[in-house]
């Protein structure tokens, strides 16, 4: 009897919510998908951005809603109301006024960003006015499909797709690691010459396709011609960081055991492998160098993501109890101007990604650093509502604390790593990445590691001056020349 009463109460509660909540009805056209859809449907609303799907997640003000559906046929509507997962408020609690609105149906075919994943279905932007009447509803038809990107090759810029058995086995489908290869001008002029390879890992959101357009600079470090390989690391859950993980799969092993041998078989490489990257790319190349130390000659890491989890933004993950608030109850910044003045906060960044659920920065960290949970998703570093840190999850993150790893294992690693690593960063980094770098610097001093740390004026973006980049290239060129001398002995 009690179970029956509870069931009836639940039914009436759902009925009441549906009856008195703001509703959006979303469908997709048969031309965009000619079969039933199972997955997540997202709604993006913005007061300022005429194309809400292009908004910078966690930075631009945005209302987001998501529902999970099964077997929805073309033309059949899905209702998004107060039962949806919502940020920052439920549909009925939204401020009344004028909004731009778009919907997207996520087929999750492997692309990183939901709004830009090839195959996903989305609606044209609409301008709507949400009034006081909650019975007012809005209808959207998704009839656009995100197209596959086409790589435009030139004489010196080529696309390279390496089949990966390791990642194919993990994802249970055919999988390739994709890159853009920029050849030096000397490659065709001297057909017998072999060249060092410079692997460039892009930052979060970077894409190797762009190199077909932007790869205009000569493929050199200093005056040394190189084969430059642009790796973007994009995967369905974010940036793979080329680290083996429970959620993304064995990206590090796939790159080193499968991609690199195939690349060196196809192009005239001389065996010298150099690494560089900025931001998430900066973290990735440090990870690769420190975990495959004999494979790479040198690494120049620029403004790497958090290399010491005692400073994950403004949070000490090992001692602090809350990701959103500091000990005085103040919001922890997620992004700053000049490293001092917040323009976003971790709470809003994390909570909006709790709705969007995959492919953005905070979720990307979890996909790399966390174990896979019982629900098949990466374990959360914190409670998405309160910000309380899950110390059980932090235990797994420790494996990816590069500073901690080097400190604890330097005795065994020193022979293969001494002199190979240079880290540079701006002293006013927007995401406060300079603080964990300085902590790592102190740890490396303590173990007497031969490792260069260089600090420059500027933030995450303005730091990359001509002089900054010249210093970075100079280090790599010098290390390469030392490698050549060793090889001749």
Region locations from a protein language model:
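Bacterial Sec-dependent N-terminal signal peptides
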Residues: 1-24
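Contiguous beta-strand segments within globular domains
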Residues: 22-28, 34-41, 178-180, 199
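Non-catalytic cap/lid and distal C-terminal segments of serine-dependent acyl enzymes
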Residues: 31, 47-489
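Residue-level hotspots within well-ordered secondary structure
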Residues: 40-48
């Amino acid at each position: 009897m009690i179970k029956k009463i509870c069931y009836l109460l639940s039914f009436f509660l759902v009925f009441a919510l549906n009856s008195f909540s703001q509703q959006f009805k979303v469908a997709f056209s048969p031309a965009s998908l000619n079969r039933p859809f199972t997955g997540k449907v997202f709604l993006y609303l913005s007061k300022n951005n005429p194309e809400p799907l292009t908004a910078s997640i966690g930075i631009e003000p945005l209302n987001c809603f998501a529902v999970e559906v099964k077997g929805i046929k073309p033309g059949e509507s899905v209702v998004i109301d107060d039962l949806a997962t919502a940020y920052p408020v439920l549909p009925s609690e939204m401020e009344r006024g004028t909004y731009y609105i778009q919907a997207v149906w996520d087929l999750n075919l492997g692309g990183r960003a939901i709004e830009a994943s090839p195959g996903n279905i989305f609606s044209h932007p609409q301008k709507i006015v949400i009034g006081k009447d909650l019975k007012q509803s809005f209808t959207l038809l998704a009839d656009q499909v995100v197209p596959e990107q086409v790589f435009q090759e030139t004489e010196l810029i080529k696309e390279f797709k390496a089949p990966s058995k390791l990642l194919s086995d993990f994802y249970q489908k055919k999988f390739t690691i994709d890159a853009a290869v920029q050849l030096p001008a000397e490659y065709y002029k001297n057909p017998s010459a072999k060249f060092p390879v410079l692997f460039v890992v892009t930052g979060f959101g970077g894409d190797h396709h762009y190199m077909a357009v932007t790869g205009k600079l000569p493929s050199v470090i200093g005056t040394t011609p190189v084969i430059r390989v642009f790796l973007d690391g994009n995967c369905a859950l974010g940036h793979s960081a080329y680290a083996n993980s429970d959620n993304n799969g064995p990206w590090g092993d796939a790159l080193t055991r499968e991609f690199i041998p195939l690349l060196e078989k196809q192009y005239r490489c001389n065996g010298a492998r150099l690494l560089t990257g900025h931001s998430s790319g900066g973290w990735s190349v440090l990870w690769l160098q420190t975990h495959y130390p004999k494979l790479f000659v040198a690494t120049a890491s620029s403004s790497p993501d958090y290399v010491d989890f005692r400073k994950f933004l403004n949070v000490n993950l090992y001692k602090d109890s809350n990701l959103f608030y500091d000990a005085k109850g103040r919001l922890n910044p997620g992004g700053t101007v000049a490293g001092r003045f917040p323009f976003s906060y971790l709470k809003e960044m994390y909570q909006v990604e709790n709705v969007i659920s995959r492919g953005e920065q905070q979720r990307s960290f979890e996909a790399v650093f966390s174990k896979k949970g019982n629900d098949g998703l990466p374990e959360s570093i914190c409670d998405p509502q309160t910000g309380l840190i899950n110390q059980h999850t932090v235990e797994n993150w420790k494996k990816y604390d590069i500073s901690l790893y080097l400190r604890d294992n330097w005795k065994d690693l020193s022979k293969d790593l001494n002199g190979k690593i240079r880290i540079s960063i701006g002293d006013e980094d927007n995401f406060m990445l300079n603080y964990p770098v300085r902590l790592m610097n102190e740890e490396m001093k303590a173990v007497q590691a031969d490792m260069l740390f260089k600090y420059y004026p500027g933030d995450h973006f303005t730091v990359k001056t001509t002089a900054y980049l010249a210093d970075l290239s100079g280090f790599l060129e010098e290390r390469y020349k030392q490698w050549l001398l060793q090889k001749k002995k």
